[in-house]
Amino acid sequence: MRDRISAFLEEKQGLSVNSKQSYKYDLEQFLDMVGERISETSLKIYQAQLANLKISAQKRKISACNQFLYFLYQKGEVDSFYRLELAKQAEKKTEKPEILYLDSFWQESDHPEGRLLALLILEMGLLPSEILAIKVADINLDFQVLRISKASQRRIVTIPTALLSELEPLMGQTYLFERGGKPYSRQWAFRQLESFVKEKGFPSLSAQVLREQFILRQIENKVDLYEIAKKLGLKTVLTLEKYR
């Protein structure tokens, strides 16, 4: 099915190179989601994935996909003329998240564990579950890298220079956060993080919001979406496109 994208683009007259690349990107992403067998069910799943994107991005992708679906129908590649529709809730305007001023996170705290948890999420985009699984053996301060293992997936992320001094005192342990050589639970991490953000005057900040702040800062620094996805351990950039 993927080879049909090239055939489709060949029939599009007058498209610029950038426009063709945009079509190709959107359609490859579409096929990644729906697979080789296009059906009402697979299209609904894809459409649901678009819900978090900006309306302009949704309209662009839906337009490209509908043109491609019509092309497939004309060529006899699919037995029905499928068509995607813009979800009604997409018409509601949502506020774009803003970068928060969180310099106070670097100041001393009565909740040092919560502070370090917050900084690891904010500065590296790590999930609490990933942080709790970190072993000291996974950290190399000399090369400023951290190895993250999650299920069958592994990735290497860079440790910001500012965090090196925060990690150094913990290098004699087994886990980064531990008690008696065993990692703490997620409930413990939640309580520590909650206490810390309350102390700093941000009671509504969650791990998810802090991870979003990492994404916003990366985009502010002109980091490519694919690179951000790689840092976060995401397989696609679909969930990041709403931040464009």
Swiss-Prot record:
SUPFAM superfamilies: DNA breaking-rejoining enzymes. Putative tyrosine recombinase. Not involved in the cutting and rejoining of the recombining DNA molecules on dif(SL) site. It holds the Pfam family Phage_integrase. Residues 90-244 form the Tyr recombinase domain. It comes from Streptococcus pneumoniae (strain Hungary19A-6). PROSITE patterns: CB (PS51900), TYR_RECOMBINASE (PS51898). This is Tyrosine recombinase XerD-like. Residues 1-73 form the Core-binding (CB) domain.
